[in-house]
Design a protein with these regions (language model features):
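A metal-dependent, Asp-based hydrolase signature
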Residues: 49-96
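Glycine-centered loop/turn motif at secondary-structure junctions
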Residues: 39, 83-84, 120-123
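Soluble or luminal CAZymes and related metallo-dependent hydrolases
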Residues: 26, 67-71, 104-111
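Active-site neighborhood of HAD-like aspartate-dependent phosphohydrolases
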Residues: 2-50
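Substrate-recognition element of Asp-dependent hydrolases with the DxDx(T/V) motif
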Residues: 91-108, 112-134
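Alpha-helical elements of Rossmann-like donor-binding domains used by nucleotide-donor carbohydrate transfer enzymes
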Residues: 29-33, 53, 74-77, 114
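Short histidine/acidic/glycine/proline-rich micro-motifs that form metal-
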Residues: 17, 61, 134
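Short, solvent-exposed loop/turn segments at secondary-structure boundaries
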Residues: 21-24, 62-63, 103-104
Length: 134
């Protein structure tokens, strides 16, 4: 009997298939870019801390309700409601991207790409299950 027992393999993304390496210059650049995008009058680290504090509050509520906001709602309603809403709406996707980068440089774990290729070549359906922002 040569029938496969499994037809699909699902992977968690953050911390399993992909990890964030602490790369301070990379992370600092992302924090600076966030500050510029928002037009924040604060110092970079002060602005970043403001976003972090508000994100923690948002995240608790989102997890409690099992519902995440899209980029526009996240930045306009939860993270930067006191900033120029037109500007924030225009750059909300970039803000989300830079926020992720501020947590570290994302890389696929050693051997991860090879595992994906091998499973694909063997005919498995592949998927990702994740609770990451963005």
């Amino acid at each position: 009997m040569n029938e496969k027992r499994y037809r699909a393999v699902l992977f968690d993304l953050g911390g399993t298939l992909r990890i964030a390496l602490e790369d301070e210059p990379y992370m600092r650049h992302a924090r600076r870019k966030m500050t510029e995008l928002a037009g924040a009058p604060l110092q970079v680290e002060d602005f970043y801390q403001l976003v972090e504090d508000r994100y923690e509050s948002y995240r608790r509520g989102a997890l409690g309700e099992n519902k995440e906001a899209g980029d526009r709602e996240l930045w306009c309603r939860w993270l930067l409601p006191d900033y120029d809403q037109k500007r924030i709406a225009q750059v909300c996707h970039e803000l989300s991207f830079e926020y992720r980068q501020s947590k570290g440089r994302r890389v696929v774990v050693d051997g991860g790409a090879e595992v994906i290729r091998t499973l694909h070549e063997r005919g498995y359906k592949l998927g990702i299950v994740s609770n990451l922002i963005g």
